[in-house]
Amino acid sequence: MAIVWLSSFRLLDLKRSDYMAAERMNDSILTSVKKMLGLSEEYDAFDLDIITHINSVFTILTQIGVGPGNGFMIEDKTPVWTDFIQDSGIYQLVKSYMVLKVRLLFDPPMSSAVLECYKTQVNEYEWRLKTMAENQEVNNQNE
């Protein structure tokens, strides 16, 4: 009985985590990037700069095969992550890549060691995203 209950609990917990991931994917792209940069949603002095950098990163993501084939851009806080990507499996990686690239463009670290660490991480994320996009393309061709 306890095993069944534990099994059900894990299943319930899994469903809850899927629900929570879906909720996060419905967050505003601009707002979530700003939060991860340490800016409040209300503080809009740098919104134009951040939006410009976000759109640059969307161009890079499109070029490596992630997101809509015809590109994507934002103009305000209205677009949410699911407007760009529906695959919850790579959502966190896309979001991490976005934030790190925007941070490097908007507010690069003063320390050369930290800067190099960020660049290395960006390169790894980019490689992983490109590889995942290529694998998905191959899988779609085989279907």
Where do the protein language model's features map onto the residues?
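Short loop/turn elements at secondary-structure junctions
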Residues: 5, 10, 15-16, 21, ...
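N-terminal, Lys/Arg- and Ser/Thr-rich interaction peptides
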Residues: 20-40
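Structural recognition of short helix-loop-helix hairpins that underlie histone-fold modules
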Residues: 33-45, 62-69
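Targeting/processing segments of secretory and organellar proteins
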Residues: 1-2
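An N-terminal amphipathic alpha-helical segment
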Residues: 67-77
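Residue-level detector of well-ordered alpha-helical segments, enriched
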Residues: 29, 49, 53, 93-94, ...
